[in-house]
Curated annotation (Swiss-Prot):
GO terms for cellular component: plasma membrane. Residues 5-246 form the ABC transporter domain. ATP binds at G37, P38, S39, G40, C41, G42, K43, S44. Its EC number is 7.3.2.1. NCBIfam families: 3a0107s01c2 (TIGR00972). This is Phosphate import ATP-binding protein PstB. Coiled coil: none annotated. Belongs to the ABC transporter superfamily. Phosphate importer (TC 3.A.1.7) family. One of its GO terms (molecular function) is ATPase-coupled phosphate ion transmembrane transporter activity. Signal peptide: none annotated. Its main location: membrane. It catalyses: phosphate(out) + ATP + H2O = ADP + 2 phosphate(in) + H(+). The keyword Membrane applies.
């Protein structure tokens, strides 16, 4: 099967500081790919390169290609707004807007020009169902998203991404601010979502990567040390540095 996203020969710089070094990596369609490695190794930079979130940072520069369905997302004429619709992002800290639960989810569709209330109602309900939040909030859609628990807020943010019908979901440490029960719910949700979406997740949590992902890439000081099936990476790593990291010898 053709990968949904292919990274080919990517070097990434902030001004003169090189953060990623000749990265070649695939993100298979409708699979979960984890990016692991110690702090400062370039994980989040790699993830954000997939939908050009790094463009917002002064001095950021990418060499190489990031191919989404074989189209280079760094082509000069590419519509970046449409790219970020196709490749959505869930951040480390839940970041609901200071609006109602309904308006949080409806925000993206409204920005895309959808105004019919009946259609917005459908999108909000479907997205909250997909994010496994509907049953908990269906009678309180008028209440502020800020009033939800941390785990509920993160699922609301996932619903907000789903509402614009992306093809890829990027998750940057989505459970680091959550308790174990909420973390388990997000991991279960990821397994449901991969039936329809390609997912890439950055995580510090080795157990989470082993449990939740199909593929894993290990980054160290900007180099992709090893990439492969998660079961292989965690049970039979080919590189001593990978073994040292996943067994806790450093990181």
């Amino acid at each position: 099967m053709e990968p949904k996203i292919k990274i080919r020969g990517v070097n990434f710089f902030y001004h003169r500081h090189q953060v990623l070094k000749n990265i070649n990596m695939d993100f298979p369609d409708r699979q979960i790919t984890a990016i692991i490695g110690p702090s400062g190794c370039g994980k989040s930079t790699l993830l954000r390169a997939l939908n050009r979130m790094n463009d917002l940072v002064s001095g950021a520069r990418l060499e190489g290609e990031v191919l989404l369905d074989n189209e280079n997302v760094y082509s000069p004429n590419l519509d970046v707004v449409n790219l970020r619709k196709r490749v959505g992002m869930v951040f480390q800290q839940p970041n609901p807007f200071p609006k109602s639960i309904f308006d949080n989810v409806a925000f993206g569709p409204r920005m895309l020009g959808i105004t019919a209330q009946s259609r917005l109602n459908e999108i909000v309900e479907k997205s909250l169902h997909q994010a496994a939040l509907w049953d908990e909030v269906k009678d309180n859609l008028h209440k502020s998203g800020m009033a939800l628990s941390g785990g509920q807020q993160q699922r609301l943010c996932i619903a907000r991404v789903l509402a614009v019908e992306p093809e890829v979901i990027l998750m940057d440490e989505p459970c680091s601010a959550l308790d174990p029960v909420s973390t388990m719910r997000i991991e279960e949700l990821m397994q449901e979502l991969k039936q329809n979406y390609t997912i890439a997740i950055v995580t510090h949590n080795m157990q989470q990567a082993a449990r939740a992902s199909d593929w894993t890439g290990f980054l160290l000081t900007g180099d992709l040390i090893e990439y492969g099936r998660t079961g292989e990476i965690f049970s039979r790593p080919k590189d001593k540095r990978t073994e040292d990291y996943i067994t806790g010898r450093f990181g």
